[in-house]
A protein has these predicted regions:
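A short beta-sheet element
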Residues: 48-50, 57-104, 109, 120-123
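Solvent-exposed alpha-helix faces
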Residues: 60, 143-146
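Short amphipathic beta-strand starts and helix->beta connectors
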Residues: 110-114
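Short edge beta-strand segments in beta-sheet-rich domains
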Residues: 17-19, 77-80, 115, 123-125
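Non-catalytic DNA-recognition/assembly elements of restriction-modification systems
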Residues: 1-14, 131, 135-143, 150-153
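Short, glycine-/Ser/Thr-/acidic-enriched flexible segments
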Residues: 27-29, 64-65, 90, 135, ...
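Sequence-specific dsDNA recognition surfaces
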Residues: 2-12, 20-54, 72-74
């Protein structure tokens, strides 16, 4: 459905000073919430970044058990430990919900590599099963999930 090995990489020096720069610590674990937005002008970042676009699903491959996944609300760039996915005809919030599901988190954790800093490998990510109901059903599922989470808060 998406390729876990493909991301558009850019040098930090090529980014506009007003670009949104997303780092791992900006995403709350297990919630899908953005904690803060930083701009290039506020950082001293010199490392390469992955580009992303509004509507992309941003997935942290580092320490998959932290379950850090958001949907981008504007274009920007992120650490190379975050993968930017364009799910095309799949509802992006449904894709986010699936990537955050216990099923996928367990799958990602079962074959991560690295002891101190485990990561989900591209091959394992590409082989993941992805249940794909019709688009209207994807929207209904997300609406139900959001309704249940509202009741929790």
């Amino acid at each position: 459905i998406v390729d876990f090995s493909k991301s558009q990489t850019i040098s930090s020096s090529m980014l506009d000073m007003d670009s949104w720069i997303l780092d791992l610590e900006d995403i709350e674990k297990d919630s899908g919430r953005l904690l803060q937005k930083k701009r290039m002008k506020d950082l001293l970042s010199k490392s390469d970044k992955h580009l992303f676009y509004k509507g992309n699903v941003l997935y942290s491959k580092l320490r998959p058990y932290l379950n850090k996944v958001i949907v981008a609300d504007e274009d920007g760039a992120c650490t190379t430990e975050i993968l930017a996915f364009d799910f095309g005809h799949i509802y992006n919030k449904y894709a986010q919900a699936y990537l955050m599901s216990p099923f996928f988190v367990d799958y990602a954790n079962s074959d991560s590599y690295g002891i101190k800093m485990p990561r989900l490998g591209s091959k394992r990510g590409n082989n993941a099963l992805f249940p794909l109901p019709p688009f209207k059903e994807q929207q209904r599922i997300v609406a139900q999930i959001e309704k249940l989470f509202e009741q929790l808060h």
